[in-house]
A protein has these predicted regions:
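N-terminal small/polar loop signature for handling phosphorylated ligands or for N-terminal nucleophile
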Residues: 53, 58-120, 222-254
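Short, highly selective alpha-helical patches that border small-molecule cofactor pockets
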Residues: 33, 37, 62, 66-70, ...
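Glycine-rich phosphate/diphosphate-binding loops that line cofactor/substrate pockets in enzymes
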Residues: 37-52, 194-202
Length: 254
């Protein structure tokens, strides 16, 4: 059942090229995420029945935001949602999924290298059908809408199971939980000479990849250790954590 929820604008929802970034506690305000997402939908045309991609870097609030956007996509008339397993999709992986499956667009939940956790940062970015960030004309329209929004649409539905690959339905909209890594790994195999790199590892080459408990971990495990034959343990800190293991996930802090 679709609910139309009355709301009032927030004055601070101006997105940049990297989307809307604020502290987690700002996003946790009642209606804050919903207002911004509805403002994005209200600024777009022609998405009825189309496909929307959703995923993020696994930081604190990621899973909750995914569930909200799924229910709002159903209420606003999307025909299908593709969401990464566990709510995980790196920014380039999300871009690839949008392009590969001909999606109308997608939401990427990330604040890049900014710290994660209940007292740290969160972000929402909308990417268009070419996989890239929304252009200024779209972000300006979104900001204008955030200043006048009076209601948003959301279906009353249970949370979907984000951890099991497969399909389900939310208020008549198809939701597919997909392997977060498979399509991106396949793209990398098209772009790079995997047999040559595999031979390099087979010859004794060693490296250590520190994923910093952030989103790259599952991709690094699959590509380096499973597909290229690097020894188990090549990837360290490879499980995404909501607070990135209490570390700042930036390899260039100096």
């Amino acid at each position: 059942m679709t609910q139309i929820v009355k709301t009032t604008p927030f004055p601070d929802q101006k997105p940049g090229t990297s989307g809307l970034r604020k502290k987690v506690k700002v996003f946790q305000q009642p209606h804050y995420i919903e207002n911004f997402v509805q403002s994005v939908f209200d600024s777009l045309e022609g998405y009825a029945g189309k496909t929307l991609v959703i995923g993020g870097d696994g930081r604190f609030l990621n899973r909750e935001a995914v569930q909200v956007i799924v229910r709002m996509a159903a209420a606003n008339g999307f025909g299908r949602v593709l969401v990464g397993r566990g709510g995980i999709l790196s920014t380039p992986a999300a871009s690839n999924v949008i392009r590969k499956y001909g999606a109308f667009g997608g939401f990427v939940l990330s604040a890049s290298h900014n710290p994660g956790g209940p007292d740290e940062d969160f972000g929402i970015k909308y990417n268009i059908g070419n996989g890239g960030p929304a252009p200024e004309g779209v972000t300006d329209a979104v900001f204008a809408r955030t200043k006048e929004i009076a209601e948003y649409r959301i279906v009353d539905a249970s949370d979907i199971d984000l951890d099991s690959i497969g399909g389900t339905s939310v208020a008549g909209m198809t939701v597919e939980v997909i392997d977060s890594v498979a399509d991106y790994a396949a793209l990398m195999e098209e772009l790079f000479d995997f047999p040559a790199i595999r031979a390099l590892f087979a010859g004794g080459f060693a490296l250590s990849f520190d994923a910093m408990s952030a989103v790259t971990g599952p991709y690094a495990h699959r590509i380096f250790e499973e597909l290229l034959g690097a020894p188990a343990g090549t990837v360290v800190n490879g499980t995404p954590l909501p607070d990135f293991g209490h570390h700042h996930p930036d390899p260039n802090l100096v």
